[in-house]
């Protein structure tokens, strides 16, 4: 398996940012780490081993980035007005810098056109991944979200403004009209949203998202695993093994 490390100064964030790439060829996957996570968590917490069969087979290439959660979602002593705006800086970093980097690497690997990217994450990483998928369906055409929450006000102590709204699928999706141009993109794309029902899981958020998607006619596989399925890496590894082959099918 090919592994590469890159770092560059991010204009969006005003600092150096790091990224690690695993694999060569196949579907590009943007991995968003769990809360407060770093780019090396994909490897250090064992998620690399869960993806290894797909990476070794040339079916996928994973790009693992840093979060900015310590300045945004987790910064409980900060002003939520500024925390959510810092989060938007991070979103611009992903869309304006990381996605072009992914496309550049894909061209090096032989892609003739810009491929769609799978957004993938667990826990708060799933929250961010789902938001990327629903906000930017031109860039992100597949989603694997495990054990996420989809109401952004949860991360900002109930605070709500236009920026929180833009990052909260449970708020913006209900207001999308059925003829919104994104609707056709959602229908072409593929999404898997999975939630356990055991300790530390919050299935209510997924159930509400499930209801909204059905109401809007937005296709997605929304799967609820058993009451023994905890909010834990060992279960996310099992879910990756189960769902990734389905997402990688042509």
Q: Where in this protein do the model-derived segments appear?
A:
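Non-catalytic cap/lid and distal C-terminal segments of serine-dependent acyl enzymes
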Residues: 1-250
